[in-house]
Amino acid sequence: AVALALALAGGSYAQDDTAKKKVKAYMVSDAHLDTQWNWDIQTTINEYVWNTISQNLFLLKKYPEYVFNFEGGVKYAWMKEYYPEQYEEMKKFIEEGRWHIAGSSWEASDVLVPSVEASIRNIMLGQTYYRQEFGKEGTDIFLPDCFGFGWTLPTIAAHCGLIGFSSQKLDWRNHPFYGKSKHPFTIGLWKGIDGKQVMLAHGYDYGRKWNNEDLSKNKDLEKLAQRTPLNTVYRYYGTGDIGGSPTLGSVRSVEQGIKGDGPVEVISATSDQLFKDYLPFNNHPELPVFDGELLMDVHGTGCYTSQAAMKLYNRQNEQLGDAAERAAVAAEWLGTASYPQHTLTEAWKRFIFHQFHDDLTGTSIPRAYEFSWNDELISLKQFSQVLTSSVNAIAGQMDTRVKGTPVVLYNANAFPVSDLTEIILEQPKTPKGFTVYNAQGKKVASQMIGYENGRAHILVAASLPANSYAVYDVRTGGSEKTISPSAASAIENSVYKITLDKNGDIISLTDKRNNKELVKDGKAIRLALFTENKSYAWPAWEILKETIDREPVSITDGAKITLVENGALRKALCIEKKYGKSLFKQYIRLYEGSRADRIDFYNEIDWQSTNTLLKAEFPLNIENEKATYDLGIGSVERGNNVQTAYEVYAQQWADLTDKNNSYGVSILNDSKYGWDKPDNNTIRLTLLHTPETKGNYAYQDRQDFGFHTFTYSLTGHDGALDKPATAIKAEILNQPIKAFSSPKHAGTLGKEFAFVRSSNDQVVIKALKKAEVSDEYVVRVYETGGAAPQQAAITFAGEIEKAVLADGTEKEIGSADFNKNQLNVSIAPYSIQTFKVKLKKKADLQAPACAYLPLDYDRRCFSWNTFRKEGNFESGNSYAAELLPDSILKADGIPFRLGEKEIANGLTCKGNVLQLPTGHSYNRIYFLAASAGEDAVATFSTGNNSQEITVPSYTGFIGQWEHLGHTEGFLKDAEIAYVGTHRHASNKDEAYEFTYMFKFGMD
């Protein structure tokens, strides 16, 4: 019976006499592999992924008790792409349960900076890959190396159907935090912010090695097991950072320990076996429970801020991906466009794997970020393309017949939004002014805020229902109050009055509604510099407490304050100054109308200051020893800076409310994550971190040198903090109303169309997408109040035919209550719920009439891996045929027929004349093209229409952030139709040398 139980638990060797064993050791092998760190992704693929698969296949064949654990779906995908024979061999061991899928995600990512939704997507993408490739799925969060763990992690894990979490980093604190310990326990239960729990195990050092010894007699294992009343140790062993495998001596030691007669029962374990052995958890009252955060104190504090461009691109991808999916769902339901599943999934995968803990965290070498920035920008372009084509498809069914120029506004948020939006209109000459009318024909406030290069920029007061589209009418005419920039030191609107000192710092901020001065007497709201930012051991990783304990300085050199806007909707002061070689330009913006209670601080900074930390400092006429910080779902209160917790993370907002709940101030942001609270009156947002280095990581003393743009905002509130309302304000900053041009035409949808809404502001729709493996739509909701269970009706534009409850990985787990077009939700505080719904389609998709134009191919652009020399797009290089679809490549719903892969499949443009089809009403031609060398300018003509088109190179980078002295910043304009993740040279695969095709169209 004992032997059978052990076999079921994890296939471990049957002990002859387990009664003699005093303690139990779950030996969890791993070859932790940093996707990028002190190397780039090409090295990872060419060396470390190969070492991992080849070495472990050897060990699995030689040692019958060996079980290998490996995490990260993207690395499995690279094995399939680059080492297909070994991949097929590996699949057999996965089937046997000896090569174990550790973790459950697409990448073993940071879990603090990514949004909650991105973390759910990470797990969903990983589990989908594992199910499709192996017929298996993970059951745990496996993060041997990561820089702190938030209170939301158990909530996310449990929602995705996972049961456990392990890491070696629980010991990576400089100071005890839980009594005399650095962590609450080594094995127990961790409760999330919604009350759901997973099992937690501390894995100790993942690089532990042994040299051919009997681990059943190992005193260290015995002592570690005795640290817990369970007499059990969960022990990593293997290698860290560079992949590979455990040493031969370590594997032999585990094998000997399994058969040994010492006091330690040795189990060659999967990463989740311990957790499974304790199911159901409520049958084990001996398990201690922890309810709270597991952050680090020193290590990782810099990771909330390092590599600011990555943080910005990541936040933008999270927001733009969401907006694109919602629009694509509505367009498909209307029957006006197909849902671009492949493009969206690949775009999410591409930026999510850069959430890896040495990538998004800002701790990799500069060369690595060239690949990261490029991938982030590719995803941004793809999301933008999907968003634009989807909104255009919806707009095509709307009535855009207006007197002036029709503009379609899109509110991607799941709640009604009244806010300001910026519209850009082509105008041949400077207009005198504009008048704007909403979808109901009512005139709304507007303000022209700029005109350059034939484009007018107009600020418009808009109000849109949840997840909706509206036609606005923009007419030339009227008059704008124009001003010439002038010196000023004060600005006010209907809510606030701001006074600046000569340095451009805010010395007075009055809430006129409450006659409340917000700035602490003798202090100023300002950009604050810490000029002794020394961090020698782990420079980018760590902001030291001694740094932020010092008094920061104001930026005073060359201060110039100018009133640059004074319109009906927006007024703005521009403050320019410098510190050393760093240049600062900050716009303080006040508004009227729906945004009147929000002050925006828009920043343009050319940063060139080493040994310097930049924060936005808010010393307030408010007193509380605690502030509230946004966690993405829910929030947490934290106190003033102490040695064990000083630089902390938050997502989109933080709040300081007076302890008597009489008044409070919320600080919102669009791309920043680090915060601190030095005293009862002050909260600070960390903006840029460039440490002084010594020895290792010397390149980090120029970290973030370059041009940065970002916004943070201040909003005051009378009375206690309203968490759902503050979350909505932060969402509006991050997901503003978007504007799209449209031609005039009739449409059955009228001038306003809404797809989905929630009846309860505390039950927020956080995701709307098509399911990965079915034709259902996925709807995910969060409860944002945290005080009591909530009910809501989620109302769709169409009738619900079917609805089920699902987990975060889109696996059905129960039934759902619905009636006609309403989905009825009952949700616990700070909980997440996911549903899959099937809607009755409004119309079937009508594919556009199209014809394929035959081409006289003269170039072998593609090659198979086995016949790489037969392709020659450029200098012996070619597109990888194995990555391309068999015949039809779709780009934004347009199908392109590719040439056969084994023969000529590309046409060299050299003055060719092509015959277009006749006798049909085709009105547009689309083609795929790429330049064989550098970007090229070519002229394409149809009839009397000629266009000069820039055709980008088929390879290289699409874009880069400009890192001063390292890279030049650029972003190519062309629409991406295809991305290939490796290139063929005549003699090898060139890993992560991308190839592209670009889509062009002409009337």
Segments from the language model and where they lie:
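CE4/NodB-like, metal-dependent polysaccharide N-deacetylase domain
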Residues: 119-147, 151, 159, 219-237, ...
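Surface-exposed loop and adjacent secondary-structure segments within mature catalytic domains
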Residues: 89-97, 117, 150-210, 952-960, ...
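N-terminal/edge-of-domain interface segments
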Residues: 842-1003
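Alpha-helical scaffold elements lining the catalytic groove of polysaccharide deacetylases
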Residues: 111-129, 204-225, 571
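C-terminal (or distal) subdomains of carbohydrate-active enzymes
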Residues: 4, 153-156, 186, 388, ...
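Catalytic grooves of carbohydrate-active enzymes
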Residues: 27-36, 42, 195-401, 412-414, ...
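Bacterial N-terminal signal peptides
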Residues: 1-9
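N-terminal catalytic cores of secreted or lumenal carbohydrate-active enzymes
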Residues: 15-122, 130-133, 159-163, 189, ...
